[in-house]
Amino acid sequence: KPKEDREWEKFKTKHITSQSVADFNCNRTMNDPAYTPDGQCKPINTFIHSTTGPVKEICRRATGRVNKSSTQQFTLTTCKNPIRCKYSQSNTTNFICITCRDNYPVHFVKTGKC
């Protein structure tokens, strides 16, 4: 697989969820081995409540490696500040800034415009 495909797969796993805000649970999700590869609790992670299409669309016509802002707002859940892997959870609706590599989202930069 090309590197972009692998990075996009990783991005989808780490940042895109089909769960509704009401059903989403930071503690359950963040304690999954996918988010704790070295056994450490990740300090913060933002999840985009969306299908993959609108997120990938942000990177359409993005050549090379570049940060791009979404043109639409997404529903987001941020899991942060774990104390013994118990997370605080906050929900918001906002634009997102992501790193694109050759038309694929590969890194979540921040909530809000770039």
UniProtKB/Swiss-Prot annotation:
Pfam families: RnaseA (PF00074)
Protein name (database record): Amphinase-2
Keywords: Disulfide bond, Endonuclease, Glycoprotein, Hydrolase, Nuclease, Secreted
Assigned EC number: 3.1.27.-
Annotated GO MF terms: endonuclease activity; nucleic acid binding; RNA nuclease activity
UniProt PTM comment: There are at least four different forms arising from glycan heterogeneity.
Active site: H15, H107
Function description: Endonuclease, hydrolyzes highly polymerized RNA, poly(U) and poly(C), and the dinucleotides CpA and UpA. Hydrolyzes 18S and 28S ribosomal RNA. More active towards rCA than rUA or rUG. Has cytotoxic activity against cultured human submaxillary gland carcinoma cells.
Residues bearing carbohydrate: N27, N67, N91
Subunit and interaction comment: Monomer.
Residues that hold substrate according to the record: K42, P43, I44, N45, T46
Gene Ontology cellular component terms for the protein in this record: extracellular region
Record keyword Cell wall biogenesis/degradation present: no
Disulphide linkage map: C26-C79, C41-C85, C59-C100, C97-C114
InterPro entries tied to this protein: RNaseA, RNaseA-like_dom_sf, RNaseA_AS, RNaseA_domain
Protein's cellular compartments: Secreted
Family listed: Belongs to the pancreatic ribonuclease family.
An individual GO BP term: defense response to Gram-positive bacterium
